[in-house]
Design a protein with these regions (language model features):
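Short hydrophobic alpha-helices and adjacent helix-cap/hinge residues
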Residues: 1-200
Length: 200
């Protein structure tokens, strides 16, 4: 196991995508799309300790923008429908915390969000392909390429304990214009110009 950092030790190496630093950027982008945003719901799996950390970072970012936060807490897939039922009329956008349970339920979550007229912000591209509005997060293709470089170093004799665990360096903004139109949202041209991918 690796302790992480520049000299992690142990036998596990790799890239960390668990960066809570991105939460503030995601909240800022949501605010850019919805300029009069006042109430932000945050969907999180409270059974995942990392998801709880990201939730805290997203809440702090929302409070910095004077947004009210509504917590949508789930522990299993069966909790999703009741969570959205309880949310009715209480928020104007939805921050979706990155989590395996949430990611595997992305189609259901996006469907509920669309019915509730809630623009969504995700941490990965895949939920946006599945009908979410936007994502801002690590470029997975770049991570896979860098992971292959780690493998190459080890095959050439490098000690895994000497290879640092690295953070992502390339991030993508993905916007689903079909979803934006379904929500009646006009995405600012300046944001579209910054997008790495626009799904139409």
């Amino acid at each position: 196991m690796s302790a992480g950092g520049p000299q992690p030790g142990g036998n596990v190496i790799g890239l960390s995508v668990q960066s809570t630093d991105l939460a503030s950027k995601r909240v800022e982008i949501l605010r850019e799309v919805i300029s009069d945003l006042r109430r932000l719901a945050i969907l999180t799996n409270v059974g995942n300790s990392y998801a709880v950390l990201e939730t805290g970072a997203a809440q702090a970012a929302a409070h910095m923008l004077d947004l009210d936060v509504v917590a949508l807490e789930i522990r299993r897939a069966e909790d999703i429908a009741p969570a959205f039922e309880a949310l009715k009329g209480r928020a104007e956008a939805l921050y979706v915390v990155n989590d395996p349970l949430i990611n595997t339920s992305r189609i259901r979550i996006n469907t509920f969000a669309l019915v509730a007229r809630l623009p969504t912000m995700h941490g990965l591209r895949e939920p946006v392909e599945a009908g979410g509005l936007m994502s801002y997060g690590p470029n997975l293709s770049d991570l896979y390429r860098r992971a292959a470089e780690f493998v190459d170093k080890i095959l050439r004799g490098a000690n895994p304990g000497d290879i640092p665990v690295e953070q992502p360096t390339k991030f993508d903004l993905v916007i689903n214009l079909t979803t934006a139109k379904a929500l009646g949202l006009d995405v600012p041209p300046t944001l579209l110009a910054r997008a790495d991918e626009v799904i139409e």
